[in-house]
Amino acid sequence: MSNLERDPAELVATSAVLTDADVEILEPRDVPLGGPRAMTVRRTLPQRRRSLIGGWCFIDHYGPDDVSATGGMRVPPHPHTGLQTVSWLFEGEIDHRDSVGSHALVRPGELNLMTAGRGISHSEVSTPGTRRLHGVQLWVALPNASRDVEPFFEHHTPVAGSIGPASVRTFVGSLAGSGTSATVFSPLVGAEIVMPADTTIEVPLEEGFEHGVLVDAGDVTIDGTPVPVSHLAYLNPGRTSLSVSSGADARIVLLGGEPLGEQIVMWWNFIGRSHEDVVAYRAQWQGEVIAGADPHGRFGTVEGYDGTPLPAPELPSVRLRPRG
């Protein structure tokens, strides 16, 4: 999914509350994806106060939306550098095409992982039969040593595990007997946990990881701290478990990883290490793809998409700052 904000350099501050239980609550902000009929996502990362959770650098939560009347999701070919996109659906179906020749469907319970590395472009379109769209779009920042790898695409279907009465589908890393062999370049975990009403579970954690818990549905408390729907709870490294309770049927997404220990420059759909990196990526996208000068350049060509690629926004008038 592309970041379609008109001013992607501006990370609008939303409140972050540190509770007595050392659970930091990050509020979402609404971001429209495209025109007036387009769907709106709820973004909890990045924020001014927090840019990364391990390597996770971008969290969009959307739906459940009835997209039958709006035309659904239609994101034209757009570029990425220095990151991995992690697509995970709860409802609906999305058609993915990219410049390394991949054509795949994103379905509930199945992972689509695209590694941009030195550069890739892709499109995302909800399928004609999709009436409701509901899920998360996540990005992982690649470590500096790996950020220029050749681009590639993977599809995985995790086997379900369990924690007490809760079901677990771990799409990155491993947790509670569930996991995939998805290729990542720093230690990470990503899992969907579905809980029945009136239950409490103890989720095992990697002590060296920092973690985030996104609440999709339910009356959820984390270590006794209420976390509203679409909000993100942040937890520092040093924990070995996490107590999650809900009075109603609940779904959460657990994300974690070793602190990246690096600063990144993130603008629009690019991640680099300097202002100059991003300026160069934008110029190449505009020159190679939008102007049609070199369809076999850094970002390649998305075959099979009926439409034109997405132009990059104008760069801000100030230098882009590293965050981390």
Region spans (language model):
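Jelly-roll (double-stranded beta-helix
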Residues: M1-G324
